[in-house]
Amino acid sequence: MHGERPTLGDIVLNLHPEPVCLNCNEQLDSSDSEDDHEQDQLDSLHSREREQPTQQDLQVNLQSFKVVTRCVFCQCLVRLAVHCSITDITQFQQLLMGTLHIVCPNCAATE
C-alpha cells in the first residue's frame, strides 16, 4: 500500500483456482464380526423397547390428566380425570380421535 488510504489498485490478489483431490484414500476394514456386533446392539435395543416395564417403573411414570370431550349423542361436554403414563394417554387420545366415543351419563342411562 502506498499512501494514507488503500485504493483498489493497491490491492493485488494473486488468486488462482487450485485443483483439490476430493477422493478419500481411507479404507475401512469391514469384517463380519463388526457387522455381527452392530446387529447384536440393534437387536438388544429393540428387545429392550419391547420389554414390559416393571410395576415400579409404571408407578414412577404415572401422571394425572384431565380429558374434555363431547358426548357422541348429545354433544354435551364430558370431563374425565385419568391417572396413567404418557404412553397410555397418547394411546387414549388416538382412540378418541378414531372410533372410540365417550357417552355422557344422561345418554348412557337412556341408551
Curated annotation (Swiss-Prot):
<dbReference type="GO" id="GO:0030430">
    <property type="term" value="C:host cell cytoplasm"/>
</dbReference>
<dbReference type="GO" id="GO:0008270">
    <property type="term" value="F:zinc ion binding"/>
</dbReference>
<keyword id="KW-0805">Transcription regulation</keyword>
<feature type="compositionally biased region" description="Acidic residues">
    <location>
        <begin position="29"/>
        <end position="38"/>
    </location>
</feature>
<keyword id="KW-0244">Early protein</keyword>
<feature type="region of interest" description="E7 terminal domain">
    <location>
        <begin position="1"/>
        <end position="44"/>
    </location>
</feature>
<dbReference type="Pfam" id="PF00527">
    <property type="entry name" value="E7"/>
</dbReference>
<keyword id="KW-0479">Metal-binding</keyword>
<comment type="subunit">
    <text>Homodimer. Homooligomer. Interacts with host RB1; this interaction induces dissociation of RB1-E2F1 complex thereby disrupting RB1 activity. Interacts with host EP300; this interaction represses EP300 transcriptional activity. Interacts with protein E2; this interaction inhibits E7 oncogenic activity. Interacts with host TMEM173/STING; this interaction impairs the ability of TMEM173/STING to sense cytosolic DNA and promote the production of type I interferon (IFN-alpha and IFN-beta).</text>
</comment>
<feature type="region of interest" description="Disordered">
    <location>
        <begin position="28"/>
        <end position="54"/>
    </location>
</feature>
<keyword id="KW-1090">Inhibition of host innate immune response by virus</keyword>
<protein>
    <recommendedName>
        <fullName>Protein E7</fullName>
    </recommendedName>
</protein>
<dbReference type="GO" id="GO:0006351">
    <property type="term" value="P:DNA-templated transcription"/>
</dbReference>
<keyword id="KW-1035">Host cytoplasm</keyword>
<dbReference type="InterPro" id="IPR000148">
    <property type="entry name" value="Papilloma_E7"/>
</dbReference>
<feature type="short sequence motif" description="LXCXE motif; interaction with host RB1 and TMEM173/STING">
    <location>
        <begin position="22"/>
        <end position="26"/>
    </location>
</feature>
<keyword id="KW-0238">DNA-binding</keyword>
<comment type="function">
    <text>Plays a role in viral genome replication by driving entry of quiescent cells into the cell cycle. Stimulation of progression from G1 to S phase allows the virus to efficiently use the cellular DNA replicating machinery to achieve viral genome replication. E7 protein has both transforming and trans-activating activities. Induces the disassembly of the E2F1 transcription factor from RB1, with subsequent transcriptional activation of E2F1-regulated S-phase genes. Interferes with host histone deacetylation mediated by HDAC1 and HDAC2, leading to transcription activation.</text>
</comment>
<keyword id="KW-0553">Oncogene</keyword>
<keyword id="KW-1121">Modulation of host cell cycle by virus</keyword>
<feature type="zinc finger region">
    <location>
        <begin position="71"/>
        <end position="107"/>
    </location>
</feature>
<keyword id="KW-0010">Activator</keyword>
<keyword id="KW-0922">Interferon antiviral system evasion</keyword>
<dbReference type="GO" id="GO:0039502">
    <property type="term" value="P:symbiont-mediated suppression of host type I interferon-mediated signaling pathway"/>
</dbReference>
<keyword id="KW-0804">Transcription</keyword>
<comment type="similarity">
    <text>Belongs to the papillomaviridae E7 protein family.</text>
</comment>
<dbReference type="GO" id="GO:0003677">
    <property type="term" value="F:DNA binding"/>
</dbReference>
<feature type="short sequence motif" description="Nuclear export signal">
    <location>
        <begin position="89"/>
        <end position="97"/>
    </location>
</feature>
<dbReference type="GO" id="GO:0019904">
    <property type="term" value="F:protein domain specific binding"/>
</dbReference>
<keyword id="KW-1114">Inhibition of host interferon signaling pathway by virus</keyword>
<keyword id="KW-0862">Zinc</keyword>
<dbReference type="GO" id="GO:0003700">
    <property type="term" value="F:DNA-binding transcription factor activity"/>
</dbReference>
<keyword id="KW-0945">Host-virus interaction</keyword>
<dbReference type="GO" id="GO:0039645">
    <property type="term" value="P:symbiont-mediated perturbation of host cell cycle G1/S transition checkpoint"/>
</dbReference>
<dbReference type="GO" id="GO:0052170">
    <property type="term" value="P:symbiont-mediated suppression of host innate immune response"/>
</dbReference>
<feature type="compositionally biased region" description="Basic and acidic residues">
    <location>
        <begin position="39"/>
        <end position="52"/>
    </location>
</feature>
<dbReference type="GO" id="GO:0042025">
    <property type="term" value="C:host cell nucleus"/>
</dbReference>
<keyword id="KW-0899">Viral immunoevasion</keyword>
<keyword id="KW-1078">G1/S host cell cycle checkpoint dysregulation by virus</keyword>
<keyword id="KW-0863">Zinc-finger</keyword>
<keyword id="KW-1048">Host nucleus</keyword>
